[in-house]
């Protein structure tokens, strides 16, 4: 989404005096900062190891944010519009700021070091990925990780390393000072990540930065959806940060699932994925890694993977030294909706029932937010198992219940009736009503069907990889969410093979090995606008002491998509870029379809500042 410049440039804004820079990309900071990390730096994807995306700096605040101006712009020129065999690029990186240098990754997986005050390039490293690869996410890289080798002296090469996991399945180590490969890591500075069962070039790739804890660098994987039943398994691997030696590996979905098979008349369990494609959080004090996982394959039919599919669609705490499971909590049982635990886990401490409780906060694409005790995995706010609609598809065995948190409230719509359909004209509304009336529609967790099912929310609804930020002074969690619905229909194998010229606009998934193929699309009117009522994107602040919404405002605008109906399009845009919060009382967020970055008042949600990125 967005215009071409969004895919290849970094824009930095600054107050005129004193000079203080703020990256345009969605950066993140921590709440309770580790004592050894200066507040001026941004050494992790989420600023601190727990991913709180909170800046303790106050130079930019509610009183002066309106004076922010562009300080400099750097063009990476790594742009693809998706022509020929090359996929479209997306510029989604979060830069790191360490030791006076800004490090960013590009859609082509180059790593670039910049002077943060001037934007001057210091060096660039090119892993030379296969740019025409069949990457399901397009050409995307969301950032890098850094590690300081305490065994090496200051000035020694590769004392500080930059780690990047690439789309063609490699882990590379780079000297932070020069941009040269760290030759003692793996073979010539890299380790191959393609040695997994079911590997398929392009379908198995990496988009998120590794996690670093102690002397380990840990990588998950992005695995394409809906190609076949037995996709590559979503293994998590920990490597020695100095040598690249594999220290341990963990599979979210075990190959042997005896209880699941017994509960479904001893069916053979066939599946893959369940992978950790998003960003992880680490807690060095507890020796824990917090891993968010996605759905098992294929996403929309689970007849060959009976049971809950643990630990897919979960947040799992692993012991960093061994990779052993400390605890796990599953957010969705037997997922049939692509409701991944897409958001990064966020680690903080909340005041609850008169006590300070260390927590991990985990959201998903269903728009549900779970608050768990970091030591035990037990819910801090109650979670109840509720009955959900059951499948009528032959061969499918649906979970009878799903876990619903009682607080915070759902952050995405869970129902849409035909009468509630939206459109800018009467003709649009009627077309949406007719489509919805023909679908199976029982609200959230209505399973895919042969007639077609309304997915509320759709698979980019709720919270995505962009995550949320936490302000410890106000105990407010801020997140952007999407309110978009979709249609999903299973097609019997013989009919799917014959679809040919009868194919509809939308996405098809082969789901090879399953008795059904998949058809899905976002539900839109003839004017190409969502059938769900606006706002289609909101920014919400949640009081995490009570688990209640503090404020909620529409985020961005989609008027540019309105054509002749532009003036009838309300505020609120689909967004795929998350917020940061500052001690100056400002929430910054970009990622909307109108190509703007905005600043909001943390206490009220009032928009204080806006600038375009194009």
Give residue spans per PLM region.
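Short aromatic-glycine motifs in intrinsically disordered, low-complexity regions
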Residues: 52-60, 169-176, 456-457, 527-529, ...
């Amino acid at each position: 989404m967005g215009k071409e410049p969004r895919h290849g440039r970094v824009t930095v804004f600054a107050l005129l005096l004193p000079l203080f820079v703020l990256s345009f990309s969605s950066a993140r900071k921590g709440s309770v900062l580790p004592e050894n990390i200066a507040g001026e730096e941004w050494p992790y994807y989420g600023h601190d190891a727990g991913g709180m995306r909170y800046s303790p700096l106050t130079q930019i605040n509610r009183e002066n944010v309106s004076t922010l101006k562009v300080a400099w712009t750097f063009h990476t020129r790594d742009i693809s519009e998706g022509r020929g065999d090359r996929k479209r690029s997306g510029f989604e990186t979060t830069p790191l700021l360490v030791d006076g240098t800004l490090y960013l990754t590009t859609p082509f997986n180059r790593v670039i070091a910049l002077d943060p005050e001037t934007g001057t390039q210091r060096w660039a490293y090119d892993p030379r990925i296969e740019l025409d690869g069949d990457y399901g996410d397009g050409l995307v890289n969301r950032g890098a990780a850094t590690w300081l080798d305490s065994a090496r002296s200051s000035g020694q090469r590769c004392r500080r390393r930059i780690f990047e996991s690439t789309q063609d399945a490699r882990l590379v180590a780079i000297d932070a000072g020069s941009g040269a490969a760290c030759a003692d890591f793996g073979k010539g500075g890299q380790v191959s990540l393609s040695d997994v069962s079911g590997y398929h070039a392009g379908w198995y790739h990496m988009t998120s930065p590794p996690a670093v804890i102690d002397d380990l660098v840990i990588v998950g994987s992005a695995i394409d959806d809906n190609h076949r039943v037995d996709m590559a398994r979503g293994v998590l691997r920990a490597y020695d940060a100095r040598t690249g030696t594999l220290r341990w590996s963990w599979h979210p979905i075990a190959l042997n699932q005896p209880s699941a098979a017994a509960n479904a008349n001893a069916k053979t369990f066939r599946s893959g994925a369940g992978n950790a494609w998003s960003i992880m959080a680490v807690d060095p004090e507890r020796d824990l890694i917090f891993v968010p996982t996605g759905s098992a394959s294929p996403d929309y039919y689970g007849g060959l993977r009976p049971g809950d599919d643990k630990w897919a669609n979960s947040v799992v705490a692993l012991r960093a030294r061994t990779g052993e499971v400390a605890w796990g909590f599953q957010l969705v049982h037997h997922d049939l909706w692509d409701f991944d635990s897409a958001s990064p886990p966020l680690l903080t401490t909340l005041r609850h029932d008169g006590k300070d409780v260390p927590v991990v906060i985990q959201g998903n694409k269903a728009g549900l937010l779970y608050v768990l005790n970091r030591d035990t995995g037990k819910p801090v706010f109650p979670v109840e198992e509720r009955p959900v609609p059951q499948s009528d598809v032959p061969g499918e065995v649906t979970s009878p219940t799903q876990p619903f948190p009682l607080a915070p409230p759902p952050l995405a719509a869970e129902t849409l009736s035909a009468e509630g359909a939206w459109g800018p004209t009467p003709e649009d509304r009627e077309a949406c009503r007719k489509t919805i009336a023909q679908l199976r529609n029982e609200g959230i967790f209505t399973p895919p069907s042969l007639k077609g099912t309304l997915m509320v929310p759709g698979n980019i609804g709720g919270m995505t990889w962009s995550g949320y930020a936490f302000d410890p002074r106000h105990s407010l969690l801020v997140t952007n969410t999407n309110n978009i619905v979709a249609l999903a229909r299973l097609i019997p194998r013989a009919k799917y093979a014959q679809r040919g010229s009868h194919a509809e606009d939308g996405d098809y998934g082969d789901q090879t090995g399953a008795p059904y193929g998949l058809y899905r699309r976002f539900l839109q009117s003839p004017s190409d606008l969502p059938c769900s009522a606006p706002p289609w994107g909101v920014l919400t602040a949640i009081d995490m002491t009570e688990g209640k919404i503090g404020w909620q405002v529409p985020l961005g605008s989609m008027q540019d998509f309105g054509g002749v109906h532009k003036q009838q399009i309300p505020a609120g845009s689909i967004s795929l870029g998350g917020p940061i919060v500052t001690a100056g009382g400002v929430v910054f967020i970009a990622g909307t379809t109108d190509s703007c970055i905005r600043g909001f008042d943390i206490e009220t949600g009032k928009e204080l500042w806006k600038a375009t990125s194009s």
